[in-house]
Amino acid sequence: ANFNAVVGKLKPGDLGIDAMHINLHKTFSTPHGGGGPGSGPVVFSNRLEKFCPTPLVKNIKGDFILVEDSNEKDLTKSFGRLNVFHGQMGMFVRAMSYMLSHGADGLKQVSEDAVLNANYLRASLSSHLTPAFDGFCMHEILFNDDFLKDTGVETLDFAKAMIDEGYHPMTIYFPLVIHGALLVEPTETE
């Protein structure tokens, strides 16, 4: 979900980013948490390649290969293998299928829709919930718990009441710097 607002719009490497964790849920249509196995590959710039742990996927002249061990000559500074398995492989396949089915232009549109939907939802909910910040948001909306003041209701109570009414609640208490944070991540393809 952390890539939703920029997928198809920019390349992290062009921003000087050397390492990035990409959540496959939401951005690339894979389940998360209670809805299924989460998955988040970590991508590295070429500059950090020799330090990467294994297993890893490398692009060699347009062919993608799975590197299982760090004994290869270009991985001499790797600290070795992280796990004995390759993560939630089904989620990688699902994400790749999603990307291929949308294509470059489709992914760019998905990104634009994510930002549009988030801002529409923010505007729609702002008379009921308190936005943590003024102005536009990207692909998710952050509210604080000011709307609950003087009610005796806490953020957790509010989220549990949503479950009682048949709604999946938003992420609560994250990020930690926002008191009583309620993080809403609308979908962009439904």
Describe the function of each predicted region.
Residues 65-141:
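Structural motif of enzymes handling amino- and sulfur-group chemistry
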Residues 129-130, 168-173:
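A short linear hydrophobic-aromatic micro-motif
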Residues 130-165, 180-190:
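Conserved PLP-binding catalytic core of the aspartate aminotransferase-like
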